């Protein structure tokens, strides 16, 4: 299966393979093992926007102990694959619905899905807590497969703003014709 193989940022054939058995081999298989991976990654890596580097691999993330959500995700995916758990990279937006607002602007986010018991489940090693409001943009083996922007020539981003709003339950129960009235 494609999501068990090494990829550009998830080097399954590295020292992480031996480490994964030591760290997680005694965990209960399935969901508990993937959650143990998320727990470890979230505790081992320090989130720091200022340390973002687009070409950081899972092994470098493990050694440097710092990174952004894509780095947390690559390391967790690599551990899963090392333990024969198919895992794929997800990129999109993650708002602050149901949690305190973050002190920094909303940005593109990364999480992963693990294939357990015949279906894919979302995990987030960076936040390591269930969240609502994910807006999935792309899936792939790692970040190399799912570039959210590709530019050509000289350019400079002038502004970038993302927001999500929770839709109230009563709004969802209105007849279709009344949707236009809400706007």
Tell me what each language-model feature is.
Residues 1-67, 75, 143, 155-175, ...:
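Secondary-structure boundary elements
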